[in-house]
Amino acid sequence: MEQQEEVPPPPAGLGLTAEEYAQVRATVEAHHRYAVGPGQCSSLLAQRIHAPPAAVWAVVRRFDCPQVYKHFIRSCVLRPDPHHDDNGNDLRPGRLREVSVISGLPASTSTERLDLLDDAHRVFGFTITGGEHRLRNYRSVTTVSQLDEICTLVLESYIVDVPDGNTEDDTRLFADTVIRLNLQKLKSVSEANANAAAAAAAPPPPPPAAAE
């Protein structure tokens, strides 16, 4: 009798059940594994959202407007695309955005490159390429997966250099805290959008019966 492959348990701290992790394990292996070298750290975070995957993905894919769900961004402007004459808002891998960060953080600006925008599989990735901040060589991937009929799972991972004078734990704590806050905002925005869409699609109530 052939022995079944044993599914490894979810990574510690991810907050997923064994059954949930089994559903997204292939996604984790394909998109959320990094070759972490000396002086680097990485992390993987998860967020359940009670909204259809399409509603969540519609928010995540907005490389041109991350402030919709990212707390600490004041503004975002797409750079002109040197490879296309239209210079419109088309989102293609290689596009750059200039992000302005709110005061109070150890950053002021960030130049970021869109690496991956896969609408079919709902995979989004970007790299920080410049700016005034301490997150050097920061690279992130976000995936949107359906868990069941009413629940979507968002996974966000990153790899980044540990700044001089900081430890891996310090760096991971800072980045994880920002991402958790953003994922919580993503949850509230996506669920509100889904509820509004459902309400708009609902048939109108029948007119009241006429009095006899």
Swiss-Prot record:
Q: Which GO terms describe its molecular function?
A: abscisic acid binding; protein homodimerization activity; protein phosphatase inhibitor activity; signaling receptor activity
Q: Which residues does the annotation list for site: Involved in interactions with PP2Cs?
A: 106, 167
Q: Name one Pfam family in it.
A: Polyketide_cyc2
Transcription is among the record's keywords: no
* Localization of this protein: Cytoplasm, Cytosol; Nucleus
GO biological process terms held by the UniProt record: abscisic acid-activated signaling pathway
Identify the keywords attached in UniProt to this record, alphabetized.
Abscisic acid signaling pathway, Cytoplasm, Nucleus, Protein phosphatase inhibitor, Receptor, Stress response
Locus of motif Gate loop: 103-107
Gene Ontology CC annotation, any one: cytoplasm
Which positions are annotated as binding abscisate? 70, 107-112, 134-140, 156
Where is the short sequence motif Latch loop located? 133-135
* Stretches for region START-like: 34-191
- Residue ranges spanning the membrane: these are none
Q: Tell me yes or no: is Nucleus among this UniProt entry's keywords.
A: yes
Q: Which InterPro entries match?
A: Plant_def-hormone_signal (IPR050279), Polyketide_cyclase/dehydratase (IPR019587), START-like_dom_sf (IPR023393)
Record's SUPFAM superfamilies?
A: Bet v1-like
Describe its assembly. Homodimer. Interacts with PP2C53. Binding to PP2C53 is dependent on the presence of abscisic acid (ABA). Interacts with PP2C50. Binding to PP2C50 is dependent on the presence of ABA.
Family matches, as PANTHER family = ABSCISIC ACID RECEPTOR PYR1, OS08G0374000 PROTEIN-RELATED
- What does the UniProt function comment say about this protein? Inhibits the protein phosphatases PP2C06 and PP2C09 when activated by abscisic acid (ABA). Together with PP2C53, SAPK8 and SAPK10, may form an ABA signaling module involved in stress response.
Q: Which family does it belong to?
A: Belongs to the PYR/PYL/RCAR abscisic acid intracellular receptor family.
Q: What is this protein called?
A: Abscisic acid receptor PYL10
What organism, scientifically named, is this protein from?
A: Oryza sativa subsp. japonica (Rice)
* Organism taxonomic ancestry: Eukaryota, Viridiplantae, Streptophyta, Embryophyta, Tracheophyta
Its gene name is: PYL10
